[in-house]
Amino acid sequence: MNTDLQDYSHKRLNILTGEWVMVSPFRANRPWQGKSEAVTNGRRPAHDESCYLCAGNTRINGEQNPKYKDIFVFTNDFPALQKDSAPFISKDGLLEAQGEQGICKVICFSPYHSRSLADMQPIEIGKVVSAWQREYKELGDMDGINYVQIFENKGSVMGCSNPHPHGQIWSQSSLPNEVIKKDQHQLQYFKENSRTILGDYIVQELVHKERIIFENHFFVVLIPFWAIWPFEAMIVPKIAQKDILELSDFEVALFAEAIAVLTQAYDKLFNCSFPYSSGIHQAPTGGENNDHWHWHMSFYPPLLRSATVKKFMVGYEMFGSPQRDITAEYAATQLKNLID
């Protein structure tokens, strides 16, 4: 780019959604007298008798967890969606509601209560990825299921109700809002260029390098040019794939390595168990031609300056558009310097 974006307030385009984010680099050092988060760095026990997710323990619904050794997947005891929910369309003037069906599952990443993905070896994370593949396939093949959302909320600041290492998988009959936006923008670009938009974006990022944190043979880990959250990151395959089912065993291992490298760098940044929400966006499962899709995994961590100061999405960001202080380039440099 011809302009040094570090010196000016500006906005950046998210090519996947068509939305803009305001960037204000000169605000990064403004004084802070607002809310500070508590830091909980104490080590948890490997097994917690009161935890509903630990191996062998009884969940709130009375069912006993198996004494699992690595991965454990079960149907959520308090699901947001129900498979047998009646389909309907209700319309009264401008008031409209539609029935939504789905299945929600919980995936425990490890039997060890004290761990997170950052504490796990790539071979262990690879088992998590393989479980994601199985669930995406199994749920996506069901009648009435058109999208499968894999995600993780880590840390109480992100609303996680249990510190045991786990994620969730929600499958549903329609496409969620964020997926609709990404589907439309990827499709438009593919129709015009016969290539995926993320494929072309990665080529450009590999030339500039300034936002890349890590890369291996098959994946790039970077701070997206349009990042909203201070240390937001994205893991993207270098070659276009519609979904994680296209990953070979070797590529699963490389994906696991990328997750391990990023989450470990996060924990080193402020010397804490770094909170975030992460999720995989991939092709819908309804049987359409999805050649325009290029799957990717995003991480949205809230911490801004330290383990106790987080970003708040309030004010202008609620009523105008997202805004960030530190640039994506600065964030990438900070994380890259922490990778061994």
Identify the function of each model-found stretch:
Residues 278-282:
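Acidic/histidine-rich, metal-coordinating catalytic segments
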Residues 254-273:
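Extended C-terminal subregions enriched in glycine
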Residues 1-164, 170-244, 250, 264, ...:
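Active-site microenvironments that recognize anionic phosphate/pyrophosphate groups
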